[in-house]
C-alpha cells in the first residue's frame, strides 16, 4: 500500500454539503474517508454509499456495541453497503458475532480498544482498574482471537500491538497530528511519520485537514510525512 491507501480523512463536518465540498476539494489526492456519527445522522449513510460507488473507500466509524444478535444483524446490513471498514467496541462476544455476520463480505472489522481522547484518569472515572496501555494490549489480543480484521488504537501502542496481533491485522490509529500542529482534544497523539514507523497500517486524520485554510495542501503535507516513513531507505 502507498501513502494514499493508508491515509483516512475523517469527514467530521455537520452537513452532507460540507462533506461533498471537502471531498471535491481533496480530489484524487484522497482515496479513503471516515464517516462517523455526526455525518451519519445527517444523512451520511446514503452519502457513504455514493462515495463508495464512486470508487472511494469508506471507513464507517459506528463503534457498535449491543447484544450479539443485534450487532450481527447490523453488521450483516452494513456488509451489503460496500463499506471497506467498520468499527465496533472490542468486547469478545460482540466481536465474534460480528465476524460471523461479515464472513465472505470483504468488510474489514476493527475493534476499538481505548479512545485516544482517554487517559488513565478517564478510565478510572469510568470504572476501569487498568491503565490505557494495558487495556489496549488486552483488547488487541481479544480482537485477534475473535478473528477481527484489525484494531483501532493510539500510535503509542502500535508497536506492542503488532507483536500481539501478528503481521496481517490492520492497525488503524487516530490521534494523528502533523508535526507542529495543535493536539486539540486528543491526549495520546503521534506524528504521521512516527505512527507508521511504530507499526500502524492506516492513519486517521480529521481536524488538521478538515479545519485547515487549504485542506488539500494540508492533506498533501500529511501524505509527504507518510511517504518519508514508507520510503525503503527509511525502513
From Swiss-Prot:
Keyword Heme: no
GO molecular function, one term: orotidine-5'-phosphate decarboxylase activity
Active site (record annotation): 63 (proton donor)
Entry keyword Manganese: no
Functional pathway: Pyrimidine metabolism; UMP biosynthesis via de novo pathway; UMP from orotate: step 2/2
Alphabetic keyword roster: Decarboxylase, Lyase, Pyrimidine biosynthesis
Domain of life: Bacteria
Enzyme Commission number(s): 4.1.1.23
Catalysed reaction, written as an equation: orotidine 5'-phosphate + H(+) = UMP + CO2
Transmembrane regions: none
Pfam families: OMPdecase
Gene Ontology CC: cytosol
PROSITE patterns registered for this protein in UniProt: OMPDECASE
Protein function: Catalyzes the decarboxylation of orotidine 5'-monophosphate (OMP) to uridine 5'-monophosphate (UMP).
Protein name: Orotidine 5'-phosphate decarboxylase
Organism this protein belongs to: Rhizobium leguminosarum bv. trifolii (strain WSM2304)
Organism lineage: Bacteria, Pseudomonadati, Pseudomonadota, Alphaproteobacteria, Hyphomicrobiales
Amino acid at each position: 500500500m502507498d501513502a494514499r491507501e493508508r491515509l483516512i480523512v475523517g469527514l467530521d463536518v455537520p452537513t452532507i454539503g460540507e462533506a461533498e465540498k471537502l471531498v471535491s476539494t481533496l480530489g484524487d489526492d484522497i482515496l479513503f474517508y471516515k464517516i462517523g456519527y455526526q455525518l451519519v445522522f445527517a444523512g451520511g449513510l446514503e452519502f457513504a454509499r455514493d462515495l463508495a460507488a464512486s470508487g472511494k473507500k469508506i471507513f464507517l466509524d459506528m463503534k457498535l456495541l449491543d447484544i450479539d444478535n443485534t450487532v450481527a444483524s447490523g453488521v450483516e446490513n452494513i456488509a451489503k453497503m460496500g463499506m471497506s471498514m467498520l468499527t465496533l467496541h472490542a468486547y469478545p462476544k460482540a466481536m465474534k458475532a460480528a465476524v460471523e455476520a461479515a464472513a465472505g463480505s470483504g468488510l474489514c472489522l476493527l475493534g476499538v480498544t481505548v479512545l485516544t481522547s482517554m487517559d488513565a484518569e478517564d478510565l478510572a472515572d469510568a470504572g476501569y482498574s487498568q491503565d490505557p496501555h494495558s487495556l489496549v494490549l488486552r483488547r488487541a489480543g481479544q480482537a485477534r482471537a475473535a478473528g477481527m480484521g484489525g484494531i483501532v488504537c493510539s500510535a503509542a501502542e502500535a508497536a506492542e500491538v503488532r507483536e500481539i496481533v501478528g503481521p496481517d491485522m490492520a492497525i488503524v490509529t487516530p490521534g494523528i497530528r502533523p508535526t507542529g500542529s495543535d493536539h486539540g482534544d486528543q491526549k495520546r497523539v503521534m506524528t504521521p511519520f512516527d505512527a507508521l514507523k511504530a507499526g500502524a497500517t492506516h492513519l486517521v486524520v480529521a481536524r488538521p485537514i478538515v479545519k485547515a485554510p487549504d485542506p488539500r495542501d494540508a492533506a498533501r503535507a500529511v501524505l509527504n510525512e507518510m511517504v518519508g516513513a514508507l520510503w525503503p531507505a527509511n525502513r
